[in-house]
A protein has these predicted regions:
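Pocket-edge structural micro-motifs
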Residues: 6-8, 12, 103-104, 158, ...
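Short capping/connector residues at structural and topological boundaries
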Residues: 15-19, 96-98, 282, 292
Length: 293
């Protein structure tokens, strides 16, 4: 969840407070927001951007905010016309871009798919959350989007660029492998909106023809065969090792003669000589941190 003030160009992160409800879980996003009500009342920012933490997107939030302010809408929801799962929320829009219908869990998805990014004034958010909590209402989708779409002006900002949800191991693997496609990389890592990462200038070393269509981080030593893989910093592939369709985290070592297919290793995993590890794109094999196999 983010808080953004266009006038002072600040972006600060708002984390949920303590968890509540049965089994230590919130009953909905509204209850989670209620837990940070004191923070919302104390901050100076005029506008709030609500986002989920499982979405991969390089979105020009400054454009979204300016568009929201210019429109005069009470809330702007970012959505896409690109297809997605039936379990998502879908909007129907009128000719002006106003949201006139909100549907969820539909058998045949129609309209614009909500990306769960919302822009609204801080004081309106406080008012909505306070009113919902007073009536034992905890769902942002049902009790705010659906119930108040007629009384308030909810508007859509349509984004048809790259947007991917990562909420399972399978989706993490699938979305990571999409980065091997140049068109996806160009869209996600747009030069006009750079993504900054920790610098490390140690070079990687390769045998001739050892790497095919792979993303290799700094400090890797590739002497075996690597194809359609993502290797994090400091990964070592020894001679005779054969790795394909894998995601290997920092410090992973694959010894001589080992064969890996569809594997995700956490940091500092060692795969011993001659081992064979086989996963699948629909069920990748995950090796825990620091394990030696």
């Amino acid at each position: 969840m983010k808080v953004f003030d266009l006038h002072c160009d600040t972006l600060s992160e708002l984390r949920y407070a303590e968890r509540r409800g049965d089994a230590g879980r919130f009953r909905g996003k509204v209850e989670a927001l209620g837990c940070v009500m004191d923070y919302l009342k104390d901050i100076r920012q005029d506008y709030v951007v609500l986002t989920d933490s499982d979405l991969v997107i390089n979105l020009p939030l400054d454009d979204v905010l300016r568009d929201h302010i210019a429109s005069g809408a009470d809330m702007t929801a970012v959505c896409t016309s690109l297809p997605g799962p039936e379990s998502d929320t879908y909007f129907q829009l009128d000719n002006s871009g106003r949201i006139v219908d909100v549907a969820h869990d539909v058998f045949t998805p129609e309209g614009f798919r909500c990306l769960n990014i919302f822009v609204l004034r801080r004081d309106l958010l406080i008012q909505l959350v306070t009113d919902c909590m007073a009536h034992n209402q905890y769902s942002f989708r049902h009790n705010i989007l659906q119930d108040r779409k007629d009384a308030l002006h909810f508007r859509a900002y349509v984004w048809d660029g790259y947007a991917a949800r990562i909420d399972t191991i399978e989706s993490y693997y699938r979305r990571s492998m999409e980065l091997l496609r140049p068109e996806i990389r160009m869209e996600l890592f747009a030069p006009q909106r750079p993504i900054f990462a920790k610098e490390n200038d140690s070079p990687s070393s390769y045998m001739d023809g050892s790497c095919v269509n792979s993303l290799i981080a700094d400090g890797c030593d590739i002497q075996g065969t690597v194809k359609n893989c993502i290797l994090f910093r400091g990964v070592r592939i020894e001679p005779g090792a054969d790795v394909e369709g894998c995601i290997l985290f920092k410090g992973t070592v694959v010894r001589r003669g080992a064969v890996l297919r569809g594997v995700i290793t956490d940091k500092y995993v060692t795969v011993q000589e001659g081992r064979t590890l086989m996963g699948h794109e629909n069920y990748p094999l995950v090796v825990a941190r620091g394990v030696t196999i």
